């Protein structure tokens, strides 16, 4: 099962990725992990990527695609793989097609922006223990205080409304167009890869059931 999972930051992709990889026995592949592994292993591509990153440059799509082809040829990808946060842009998606990388399914987990803002901006964290609360869905017994220690809860910088809205605007301009790209690709190729749009609201179990049904 060769899968791409699409969706905005905070849509719940991480949770669903875990269920998919366990169910199908496939690895979750992110470009970040892939780059780090190639650099660590000192492969030819890894050395190239490291020199670019050390100079503060952006790794080109050509190099990313070469790394992807390398990665999916490894033994743990025999049953397939799940791409996490890749492709991010239309040129990357087109390069994947040109490189002959076949996909079985593209699953979009769709959640409205306002719901995502509420989900993420409502998070509060007890830094020392890592305990996470939510002012609406999982509030502490006393507002702003950790249940166990009574210490102050904080909002992570990444979780502020301003940061979340910025990340969403980047997603809409760069990654959202992939939805249309894969819908068109599927229509053109007689339903391959199979494209599924799944609303990411409701219980985790209900969303997982819909995701697994889409992949069956």
Swiss-Prot record:
Residues 30-59 are annotated as: NMP. One of its GO terms (cellular component) is cytoplasm. GO terms for biological process: AMP salvage. Pfam families: ADK, ADK_lid. GO terms for molecular function: adenylate kinase activity; ATP binding. InterPro entries: Adenyl_kin_sub, Adenylat/UMP-CMP_kin, Adenylat_kinase_CS, Adenylate_kinase_lid-dom, P-loop_NTPase. Keywords: ATP-binding, Cytoplasm, Kinase, Nucleotide biosynthesis, Nucleotide-binding, Transferase. It comes from the Bacteria. Residues 122-159 are annotated as: LID. Monomer. Catalyzes the reversible transfer of the terminal phosphate group between ATP and AMP. Plays an important role in cellular energy homeostasis and in adenine nucleotide metabolism. Belongs to the adenylate kinase family. This is Adenylate kinase. The lineage of its organism: Bacteria, Pseudomonadati, Pseudomonadota, Gammaproteobacteria, Pseudomonadales. The gene is adk.
